[in-house]
Curated annotation (Swiss-Prot):
This protein's UniProt keywords: DNA-directed RNA polymerase, Nucleotidyltransferase, Transcription, Transferase
Annotated protein name in UniProt: DNA-directed RNA polymerase subunit alpha
Region Alpha N-terminal domain (alpha-NTD), annotated ranges: 1-268
Region of interest (Alpha C-terminal domain (alpha-CTD)), ranges: 280-372
Reactions performed catalytically: RNA(n) + a ribonucleoside 5'-triphosphate = RNA(n+1) + diphosphate
Amino acid sequence: MIFDEDSNSVTQDSGYMTVGNAYSNAVGYISMSDHWSKLTKPSSIKVESNGASPNKADLIVEPLESGFALTLGNALRRVMMSSLRGFAVYGVEIENVLHEFTSISGVREDVTDILLNISMMRVKLSGLSNKVLSLRVKGPCEVRSGMIPDTDDCIILNKDLLICTLDQDVDFNIKMYVNSGKGYVPAVKRKSVSKLSDVPVNFIATNALYSPIKKASFKVESSRIGQFTDYDRLVLSVETDGSILPDEAVALAARILQDQFQPFINFDETDEPHKKIDTKDALPYDSNLLRKVDELELSVRSYNCLKNDNITYIGDLVQKTESDMLRTPNFGRKSLNEINELLASMNLHLGMKIANWPPESIESLSKQYSEE
């Protein structure tokens, strides 16, 4: 390998490779948008129910560039667990109780146990940021969260939660203060604030867990586009408390990340030099539609099925429905999945309607696209 100071170049002495001033001409112009637009993006996000509850679901995202499933999965999970806002009970008033280190006559649990139970109560407010819930019960009975009546602006999500047990014929009167927030706020932190606020003398702060996410995990699997298997599939498993749906939680986490990343983008995309509009841009069809199906990395069985059905161009293929394809002789579910994945990688799908197809002189148009 020889370094030439005059030409500012490095030449491999075997003659197979030259790196120098001519390198940029060989590579060509790279636009700013190429850095993100050339990457493979997920064609769809599939939501699969995980059990009978609508609060549990798996979100399957594919295809992703290699390594992106781990990057995105970890970021989305951490944001969901830490930063989504929800509702929680942050304090209570219990009749004839001045502090948490006491017991109530006729009540099996002491006040600390009652506060612990109440901290697990899940609430959803609509159109409000805070509310006071009141409950009056006469024993003997079990006091459960479902005894608090639902209203138009407040719903108790876990109605079977045990608050306390009344063993005798006693009255149990309690007020619960609900507000919105994020993360976990311990009672100790709330007490320091309540001293400065106008709160009742018998107000008792509780630990408040605002996060609407009960569980969130992810796993990374392999995905494929045609014959290429070096892509990622991200499977996000999310369980919420019922105040939001799992796919809504993921969408909110993605929006938070988008907002946090925005300050790092220190350029204006409108400043990018305008590219010369070539003939390819002026033509009315997506270039992929004018490609022939024999250019795709299809299995022999799938290709022969398309050929026997007189499907020559991708534009012919995408206008077929899944039912049409499955009626093709020797064409099975495996071939259908293969074609769906390939079309998805080009942002196409079966069952599309394309006006004025096929175009006149389709052969020359296809050749023009392939040359460019």
